[in-house]
């Protein structure tokens, strides 16, 4: 049977709670209330980009949220972030360090191949990673990745 994985992110300008404890709570309550079972829960941090960034600005939460992300920086998450071992490939073949950089149209660094047709693993693995303020979202607290928290 295919595993069922649920994904959640906080509503508002907050960091996600601890993934393990929230998963236990969700498993208990979804089973009790609805008879639903699932295999895993991934907690994802909201990235300060696109519509969420617009909401942060419009609601006056941008400064506080960014301060919260920066204050929660966890160096132990850096090795597990998406950009360290994954590339995003655009529809047109352009390469990005992560999905968020792709959304922001921030291609991989100039020294690396910038298109899939020029793929060169040694140059790509030794590249500098293009970063921005949104990167604090992946390194805050327990970290955040496509698979939920990192640490």
Name each region found by the language model.
Residues 1-79:
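Radical SAM enzyme [4Fe-4S]-AdoMet core and its adjacent flexible, acidic
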Residues 2-4, 85, 134-136:
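A generic secondary-structure signal marking the coil-to-beta-strand transition
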Residues 22-26, 94, 134:
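Alpha-helical structural motif
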Residues 42-43, 83, 98, 146:
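Generic recognition of cysteine residues
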Residues 45, 90, 142:
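Residues that line or immediately flank small-molecule/substrate-binding pockets and catalytic motifs
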Residues 48-56, 85, 99-104:
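Hydrophobic scaffolds flanking metal-cofactor catalytic centers in soluble metalloenzymes
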Residues 70-101:
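C-terminal accessory regions of radical SAM enzymes
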Residues 95-151:
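Flexible mid-to-C-terminal extensions adjoining Fe-S/redox cofactors in radical SAM and related proteins
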């Amino acid at each position: 049977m295919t595993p069922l994985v649920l994904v959640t992110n906080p509503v508002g300008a907050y960091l996600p709670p601890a993934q393990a404890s929230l998963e236990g709570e969700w498993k208990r309550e979804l089973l009790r209330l609805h008879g639903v079972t699932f295999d895993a829960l991934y907690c994802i941090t909201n990235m300060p980009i696109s519509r969420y960034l617009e909401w942060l600005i419009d609601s006056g939460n941008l400064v506080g949220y960014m301060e919260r992300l920066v204050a929660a920086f966890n160096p132990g998450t850096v090795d597990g972030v998406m950009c360290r071992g994954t590339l995003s490939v655009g529809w047109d073949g352009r390469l990005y360090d992560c999905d968020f950089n792709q959304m922001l149209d921030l291609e991989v660094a100039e020294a690396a191949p910038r298109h899939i047709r020029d793929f060169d693993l040694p140059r790509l693995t030794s590249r500098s990673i293009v970063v921005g303020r949104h990167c604090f979202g992946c390194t805050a607290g327990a970290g955040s990745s496509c698979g939920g928290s990192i640490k």
